[in-house]
UniProtKB/Swiss-Prot annotation:
Residues 588-769 form the Lon proteolytic domain. The active site is at 675, 718. It comes from Nitrosococcus oceani (strain ATCC 19707 / BCRC 17464 / JCM 30415 / NCIMB 11848 / C-107). Homohexamer. Organized in a ring with a central cavity. Transmembrane segments: none annotated. GO terms for biological process: cellular response to heat; protein quality control for misfolded or incompletely synthesized proteins. This is Lon protease. It is found in: Cytoplasm.
Amino acid sequence: MENNAYPTLPLKNTVLFPHLVLPLSVGRAGSIAAVEAALSSEDKLIAVFPQKDPRTDEPAADDLFRFGTVGIIKKMVRSEDTVQILVQGIERVEQLEMVQKQPYLSLKIATLSEPSDTGTEIEALHRTVIELAGKMIELVQPQIQVGIHHIISDVEKPLHQIYLLTSILSLDFDKEKELLAAATQVEALQLMHRYLNHEVQVLEVRQKITSTAQTEIDKKQREYVLRQQLEAIQEELGETNPEQAEIKELRQRMEETELPELVRKEVEKEITRLERMPSAAPDYQLTRGYVELALELPWNKTTEDRLDLKRAREILDEDHFDLEDVKERIIEHLAVMKLNPEAKSPILCFVGPPGVGKTSVGQSMARALGRKFERMSLGGLHDESELRGHRRTYIGAMPGRIIRAIRRTGYQNPLLMLDEIDKLGRDFRGDPAAALLEILDPAQNAEFHDNYLDLPFDLSKIFFVTTANTLDTIPRPLLDRMEILRLPGYSDEEKQHIARRYLIGRQIREAGLSEIQLSIPDETLSYLIRRYTREAGVRELERMLGRIARKVATQVATGQTQPVTVTPQDLVELLGPERFFAEEMRQQLAPGVAAGLAWTEAGGDVLYVEAALLPEGKGMTLTGQLGSIMQESAKAAQSYLWSRAEELNIDQKTIRESGVHIHVPAGAIPKDGPSAGVTMASALTSAYAHQPVRSDTAMTGEITLSGLVLPVGGIKEKVLAAHRSGIQRIILPKENEKDLREIPEHVRQSIQFILARRIEEVLAEAIPDLNR
């Protein structure tokens, strides 16, 4: 066999060892040709070499491992595309050179003499390897240990025993090649010793894990059998009681509920306490309530979000008129969730006057997302424990509102609305706003600890939405965690649209009427809005429509069959006298009176500032519950006018000899803020110059001592209030020009906007006759 050329069979992922029989499936055309060539030879010998890279499809000599095995083909079976052969290894060989590559690979090879080294080291290694092999077989299949031991013992040479062990030891391809290349028996025994030692260690660890798991299973089975026997004995003795049945039910629920491991251990501990506790014990009901809470909380139960943007937009448009900024932000979040399911939900804060739809927008969001909705009012909340829960050591302890809300929804990812967050209180019992910092912070709320539950609960999947009428009372750290979305008030035309699309039909249905029985024309609706409601939202408007519907329902119930069409004249009979007249602008203003625009929690308002000169008086008197900022604005306006008296055509003698009294009507309502500065300056100038301010003009803006007009907030609400009052001209700071884009188009068209940088420009527009 020395230096002869043989048909060569490359192997992708296995090795043929001498004296072992290996079944092979041959599918490559070159390999099949090599098999056929070997079978056609007299000795049926074939050289078998493992490939260096199994991914090589047509290997040459350089692609094969240096060492291989010459084998004899014992059997061959043909199938459609492959050839199945049985090859017995004879001896190790080394490739010398390639003779041919086509039609099959043929290599010239050299036979490697079988190592015959001996000595005490080889004997010691050999015995250790045989012991490790026996231990491995015992760990895997003890029942075949004796049979395998006899098979190995029948093989005389240690090297042949090592090759035999490869058939029962799962070695990877590289280790098999490493073993085939071993030049001495010592090297081969050392390699096999290392492989077997690693395998035995892995099997021992696996057996230990299996044994531990089995012990735990046996323990639980034993407990189960003993409990069943105990229940049977108690039943025979007639000693069963409702408490035991209750505990049994709790334990069964615990087994059936998917709980985190930490929670399961705590619940198991509490149920065990219940079993040992008399039902009359003070802690019994508290412990039972705790277990029920832990079992009812949705630890891993979530609803699947509906991320159909088109459908979500339809739902939002169906439920609410306008509010484009809010709707766009919601759709943006849905788009982000669709592209990145792991994205954290934002904490939205809807800010706006009452009745503009803040709470109902939250309900629509939940409907669009397919999530459960839960609302929680925080107005007047002053105890931190209301949010975090009370510790169970206290009598009457309860979980906090957050955990109770999640329990009611039954899901871990509801949309939770925290209403009236601007009306949180605080006292000696703690600051609820500080507790909300943890609840709303995505970096902390993944492991929220309720004092009652005392287990980490993940709040990060909740979509938090808050509402407020104003941001002034919200602590700054809490405000920083929220994204502000403003919902300003509605114009009269928008209110008509909302009433026509949503409110009228709802009130007619609630009164048990049909739309045929009651109709409200646009003229009547407009009159109702202007004369019977004065609000930024539509809550009072809906109440008025409800009163009309109930009056008509009363008529129908008493026998009237004719359909009712409500006219403006009918409103006095149905609703009583007109409620609002002041919203109409004053037809003529006396000198010293100017119309200003104010922002309130209920929306915008027209505020008249009155200034009167006091003969022989001194200084300035301010009335109308004015805050410190408004008082400072009045003083700044007066100082500016005194310094510019000659330019403004104001008699300096009048200034020296007269005091001034500034009053802002609605004295029962506290007022503050810088936006009345230009109004006070105009009223004072009008009083000093004895020239009236234009009655069709209202204004807003902060002033400085040098006469600059600075920007203010709440422009949309103020403009809508002016529009409701019939104001035709509005003077605004130049820097507020950007805010006019938020004003509805029909309102912008009906009002002339004058933008001013200095107070002189304001006075020129507000008091046309000032310098004449």
